[in-house]
Amino acid sequence: MGDTTNFSGDFRGAIVNFKSTLSNVEQSVGAMPTADGAEREELARLVRELSAALESLPDDKGEVAEVLARQTETLVEEAKKDKPNRTMLGISADGLKQAAETVADVAPKVLGVARQIAEFFAKFGGG
């Protein structure tokens, strides 16, 4: 039994969902024992930048916004563990970048911030 996310239906509310998810992620960053204060502030700033960049997405890209928020959440939750799973971090960082690439033509800032977040987690063995 694993965590599976299936997307179907009307995503007009996805904008609210990604904002809520990323707000929770930003709050969770403070609980990362594997990062020092400066690193946590850097990551919190990147999460805020991602949230702002996602707001520029057209309504029909709400599903992608939600995926990006959840991938970021997965990265932070894994990094909060005493012994983060490097494979999980790498796969999640790759997924974050891949999702961002799908909207790079309409929101290039999203891809730039997603890459920075993935690079941040590379120092923990992911990406």
Q: What are these model-predicted stretches?
A:
Residues 104, 108-111, 115:
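Amphipathic alpha-helical hairpins/coiled-coils and adjacent low-complexity
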